[in-house]
């Protein structure tokens, strides 16, 4: 019996198919708020399969191993010129392999049988996020590495390099700015429509369990950098593009995907003001930011 579970994130439906007998209760818990049972067509389906050895499904031609910290991202070239992917906790070898057939919307992520209990959640999470960015790019949809809070019905997105203090700044708003809640703490999604940009909660929120199926109009995007003072400035369009673009997940080796992302970022920055906040991790930083972004 097929163990298929369907979800909608930012209006895009996808499925996750587990091996028969494998429980979704713990493995797919972050996805529960996004679960659906309807007839809408799925963009893609991910199937989890277990093998004795990953070498039986992995290409021997490794093109790249990317990222400065886990999860490490592997790119393999197949004999037919297509790509497959891997994810791992270390740079020694991939812990799972993702195959994305060009002629089908069903992909497969493989884990070893002896590592399935430990690695299944890791494999599914990383594979689904990658597939989501692939398949939603043509629909003005961007997954962003950011922390987002909702305040009085609007979303405020904080960008920055790892360790800059995105989550810390969100917590400062939660602690000091009334009527504020956390929407997502690691991988929110922006979707652009004709006259507005919306930001959505997702099942992917990093170390913070914040899986909210809600969306709000995106009111501001703020890139953070650490400083011994608190100062904020609005960015010009070119600066805004350069600020948002690197934070977006994308298949950067694919010209078509990159073209879609460029257009989506351009649309976003024409609708949403972008800022640079040089700041300390203190209450004043939240208030300086609040006063600037709500003045628009």
Give residue spans per PLM region.
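Hydrophobic positions on the alpha1 helix immediately C-terminal to the Walker A/P-loop
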Residues: 169
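Conserved glycine(s) of the Walker
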Residues: 165
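A noncatalytic interaction/capping subdomain that flanks phosphate/NTP-handling catalytic cores
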Residues: 1-157, 162, 172-181, 189-296
């Amino acid at each position: 019996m097929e163990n298929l579970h369907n979800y909608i994130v930012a209006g895009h439906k996808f499925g996750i198919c587990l091996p028969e007998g494998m429980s979704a209760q713990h493995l797919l818990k972050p996805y529960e708020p996004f679960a659906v049972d309807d007839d809408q067509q799925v963009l893609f389906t991910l199937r989890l399969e277990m093998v004795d050895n990953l070498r039986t499904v992995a290409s021997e031609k490794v093109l790249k191993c990317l990222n400065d910290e886990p999860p490490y991202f592997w790119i393999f070239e197949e004999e037919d010129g297509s790509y497959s992917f891997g994810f791992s906790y270390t740079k020694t070898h991939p812990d799972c392999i993702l195959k994305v057939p060009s002629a089908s919307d069903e992909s497969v992520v493989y884990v070893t049988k002896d590592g399935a209990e430990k690695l299944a959640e890791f494999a599914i999470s990383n594979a689904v996020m990658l597939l989501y960015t692939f398949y939603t790019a043509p629909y003005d949809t961007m997954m962003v590495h950011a922390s987002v809070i909702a305040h009085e019905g609007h979303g405020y997105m904080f960008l920055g390099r790892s360790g800059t203090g995105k989550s810390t700044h969100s917590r400062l708003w939660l602690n000091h700015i009334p009527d504020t809640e956390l929407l997502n703490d690691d991988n929110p999604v922006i979707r652009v429509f004709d006259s507005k940009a919306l930001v959505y909660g997702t099942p992917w929120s990093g170390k913070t369990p914040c899986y909210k199926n809600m969306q709000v109009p995106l009111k501001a995007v703020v890139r953070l950098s650490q400083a011994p003072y608190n100062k904020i400035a609005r960015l010009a369009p070119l600066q805004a593009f350069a600020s948002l673009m690197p934070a977006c997940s994308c298949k950067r080796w694919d010209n078509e995907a990159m073209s879609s992302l460029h257009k989506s970022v351009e649309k976003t920055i024409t609708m949403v003001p972008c800022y640079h906040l040089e700041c300390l991790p203190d209450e004043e930083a939240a208030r300086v930011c609040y006063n600037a972004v709500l003045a628009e």
